[in-house]
Amino acid sequence: MYLNSGSELVYSPSDLILFVQSPFACWMERLRLVRPDVAVRDEPSEELMLIAKTGELHEAAYLQSLRDANHDICEITGDRHHAGTATLQAISDQREIIFQSYLSLPPFAGYADFLVREAGNDTRYEIWDTKLARKPK
């Protein structure tokens, strides 16, 4: 979660997951935004850093497998504003796969690992996430 330029809260998919797991932890994240002097975030554990790195490696390997299969892939880069505009353009262009798309509908916003156009439907996309889990399943 973060405060946008208008000082409004914006929630990510990870924030929603955190709220489901622990409303208190989510509340503490919000307190950290408005009172960073009283709500200090713990340093990530080695285990959590390993899980995150493994997720990033998995995402990169999956992206490479899509490239190797010659899929039409649009890779989005840049800040939220640019990424949002580029995502809408890629959807308008009916790109098959959009990597690191940025979607927003206030008060929610976030990056999707992959938007994948449904077969036989030029305007409908599925969101595929490769690393939202915070622990092994």
Where are the regions a protein language model picked out?
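A conserved hydrophobic secondary-structure block that centers on an alpha-helix together
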Residues: 121-137
